[in-house]
UniProtKB/Swiss-Prot annotation:
Residues 79-174 form the Toprim domain. It comes from Trichlorobacter lovleyi (strain ATCC BAA-1151 / DSM 17278 / SZ) (Geobacter lovleyi). May play a role in DNA repair. It seems to be involved in an RecBC-independent recombinational process of DNA repair. It may act with RecF and RecO. Belongs to the RecR family. Pfam families: RecR_C, RecR_HhH, RecR_ZnF, Toprim_4. The keyword Metal-binding applies. This is Recombination protein RecR. The lineage of its organism: Bacteria, Pseudomonadati, Thermodesulfobacteriota, Desulfuromonadia, Geobacterales. It comes from the Bacteria. HAMAP family: RecR. Keywords: DNA damage, DNA recombination, DNA repair, Metal-binding, Zinc, Zinc-finger. GO terms for molecular function: DNA binding; zinc ion binding. The gene is recR. InterPro entries: DNA_Rcmb_RecR, Rcmb_RecR, Rcmb_RecR_Znf, TOPRIM_dom, TOPRIM_RecR.
Length: 197
């Protein structure tokens, strides 16, 4: 059917490049967009605007439309830098309203299997920020994956000689969870990271 509509075939192919979108979902999305031309136009306009306006902050490397970003230019506590893998991770921390310092987005994690080395990340820029500023603490908030843990250990080795406090986000049992349903590795981390009451 799609061999007679190369433009539609291309749209489906582009949609399939998005994470979690397979052939059937891409087809469904393409046909939905074609049914409502105003949605198609709005989506095209939004994609064009994102491409034209969104960039990485020159200080923390988070995605932003303002450079430096509102967090870097907004008078936040610059003595503490929270290091995250992605802008999405930064947004999750912001939604928690538990942190009020500055950020540094690595734009990935060390992954030798995928060919991502420390030089491919924004680690050099982090070290330069620390050397230039009055940073007292770096909070490492990489994901609790093999890549995130590898990145955290690498960062800790790079940062400790600088004489600043280096901390890692705690990990443990999620709020509202029954212990019987939590995986053994998480229970181990929670037990090791227990605190006084």
């Amino acid at each position: 059917m799609l061999q007679h509509a190369p433009t539609l075939t291309r749209l489906v192919g582009e949609l399939k490049k998005l994470p979690g979108i397979g052939e059937r979902t891409a087809l469904r999305l393409a046909f939905h967009l074609l049914k409502s031309p105003q949605n198609l136009g709005s989506l095209a306009e939004a994609l064009t605007q994102v491409q034209e306006r969104v960039c990485a902050c020159s200080v923390c490397f988070a995605l932003t439309e303002q450079n430096p970003c509102p967090i870097c230019s907004g008078g936040r506590d610059s003595s503490v830098i929270c290091v995250v893998e992605t802008s999405q991770d930064m947004l999750a921390l912001e939604r928690s309203n538990a942190y009020h310092g500055s950020y540094h987005v690595l734009q990935g994690a060390i992954s030798p299997l995928h060919g991502v080395n420390p030089d491919d990340l924004r680690i050099r820029e982090l070290l330069m920020r620390i050397e230039q500023g009055k940073v007292e603490e770096v909070v490492i908030a990489t994901n609790f994956t093999v890549e995130g843990e590898t990145t955290a250990l690498y960062l800790a080795r790079q940062l400790k000689p600088l004489g600043i406090r280096v901390t890692r986000l705690a990990h443990g049992i999620p709020l509202g969870s029954d212990i019987e349903f939590v995986d053994p590795a998480t229970v181990q981390w929670a037990m090791k990271g227990r605190s006084e009451l």
